[in-house]
Amino acid sequence: MKRCACLSNSPTRHTTVVVPSPVISSCAAAALAISTAVGDWICISVSNTLPSLVSLMLPAPSTSIFSVPLGPKLVSRTDCKPSADVTLTFKAASLLNDSAFGFNNCNDMLLLYLYYNLLLLTASTPLTFTFSTHCTHTLLYIILSVFRSFLTRITTTNTSPSENFATKAKLP
């Protein structure tokens, strides 16, 4: 059996396969802003997948998420480049006036913006990592919880008692 010369001379390609760890996603309406800004997003089904590992390399390769029997129902391919954050800000800001999307105050938009940028930070770190996707989401949740409590304190100290009650009612 002969080996093709073009295969032996071709450069090595690195591909990172990302399969989410057990996560139940609610596909919240806030994802609409990310979908509109980035042009692509992943919705994980309520089914669980087995725990998996994610490898990130430089230069950041495109990320493929493949459909597995008990895993994601949507298949997407996108580049790991932090290029849509400004677009996301404008799209999220335009949704602030529409309560159907869950944005009732500036805090919600800030939390969405922070979460998106933290995801970009983990996707474009200049080192090679192997980590669990579930651990990453847990860490992001903890950071956002601390940031949310910080925003609540700022809002509480800068508003009247009636506005204070309304703000607390909006933050779950």
UniProtKB/Swiss-Prot annotation:
**Where does the chain cross the membrane?**
109-129
What is its membrane topology? Single-pass membrane protein
Keyword Transmembrane helix part of the UniProt annotation: yes
Subcellular localization is given as: Membrane
Q: Which domain of life is it from?
A: Eukaryota
Q: Its principal location?
A: membrane
- Record keywords: Membrane, Transmembrane, Transmembrane helix
What cellular component terms from Gene Ontology apply here? membrane
Leftover remarks: Partially overlaps CCT6.
Q: What is this protein called?
A: Putative uncharacterized membrane protein YDR187C
Q: State the organism's lineage.
A: Eukaryota, Fungi, Dikarya, Ascomycota, Saccharomycotina
